[in-house]
Amino acid sequence: MKTKAGFVALIGKPNAGKSTLLNTLLNAHLALVSHKANATRKLMKCIVPFKDKEGYESQIIFLDTPGLHHQEKLLNQCMLSQALKAMGDAELCVFLASVHDDLKGYEEFLSLCQKPHILALSKIDTATHKQVLQKLQEYQQYDSQFLALVPLSAKKSQNLNALLECISKHLNPSAWLFEKDLMSDEKMRDIYKEIIRESLFDFLSDEIPYESDVMIDKFIEEERIDKVYARIIVEKESQKKIVIGKNGVNIKRIGTSARLKMQEVGEKKVFLNLQVIAQKSWSKEEKSLQKLGYTHQRNRD
């Protein structure tokens, strides 16, 4: 069997549809999806097998990254650091741009990325044929920069094979790097954490999801049931009250939604215990961020 394997950094502005694309390619719910921008905070490896036209069985290891953005808050700097690290580690990049975005995000990407890349135009199902053609023409001025320009829709599964074919074409022959049926090397407790965070985005509005995070305090993995004890961390007592809700209605909704998604992903029953705490300025303190698994790589002179 002829095989290929390689790491591919998936880069884009917030809300470009990176996580939706990966979940569609995997046919599974692993990456956090939200209608709110900038929901993804950590790098995640997603492993997609693909047989290309040349007969190669390719193992494409996508590095799902936080959206490219610049803010002074330390948490946001940690997120940008992860995206930059992914670009450095990958042998190929895919820049995902919404058909509704201007070209500034891609121009910023070009200033940061030194690796060969494919430009993918997402959400074409939400635009007219004329709008898609116009946007493709706008990007053509950079045709010497990218390997290929692929319009696609993750929601409608349009042109996804074309993207995978293009990626596989530019990977080198190699033995597979992971087991055949593995979709991610993420630990289940980390996947469960992201599912709880996704439920926060689903049920809470305004700034609260962005000023909150989740700490898994205890995780017990048994044959028939997983037991998860977690804390939702917010910055203000007023936010804590909103997360809990009157008579606990909000925290019950968040917990029920998260538990059902966990059971679907883990394919077993899940017991979920959620607590809510207020911790002032957690997103600005390096020690707090390290406990939550965030790291910041500072630039060296």
Swiss-Prot record:
Residues passing through the membrane, by range: none
InterPro entries per record: G_ERA_dom, GTP-bd, GTPase_Era-like, KH_dom-like_a/b, KH_dom_type_2, KH_sf_prok-type, P-loop_NTPase, Small_GTP-bd
Signal peptide range in chain numbering: none
Region (G3): 64-67
Region (G2): 38-42
Biological process terms in GO annotation: ribosomal small subunit assembly
Disulfide bonding pattern of the chain: none
Spans annotated as G1: 12-19
G4: region residues: 122-125
All residue ranges annotated as the Era-type G domain in the record: 4-173
Assigned GO CC terms: cytosol; plasma membrane
Entry's Gene Ontology molecular function annotations: GTP binding; GTPase activity; ribosomal small subunit binding; small ribosomal subunit rRNA binding
Keywords in alphabetical order: Cell inner membrane, Cell membrane, Cytoplasm, GTP-binding, Membrane, Nucleotide-binding, Ribosome biogenesis, RNA-binding, rRNA-binding
Region (G5): 152-154
Cell compartments where the protein resides: Cytoplasm; Cell inner membrane
Annotated binding of GTP, by residue: 12-19, 64-68, 122-125
All copies of domain KH type-2, residue ranges: 204-280
Membrane topology, from the record: Peripheral membrane protein
PANTHER family: GTPASE ERA, GTPASE ERA, MITOCHONDRIAL
Biological role: An essential GTPase that binds both GDP and GTP, with rapid nucleotide exchange. Plays a role in 16S rRNA processing and 30S ribosomal subunit biogenesis and possibly also in cell cycle regulation and energy metabolism.
Assembly and oligomerization: Monomer.
Family, similarity comment: Belongs to the TRAFAC class TrmE-Era-EngA-EngB-Septin-like GTPase superfamily. Era GTPase family.
Protein's UniProt name: GTPase Era
Taxonomic lineage from the root: Bacteria, Pseudomonadati, Campylobacterota, Epsilonproteobacteria, Campylobacterales
Gene that this polypeptide is encoded by: era
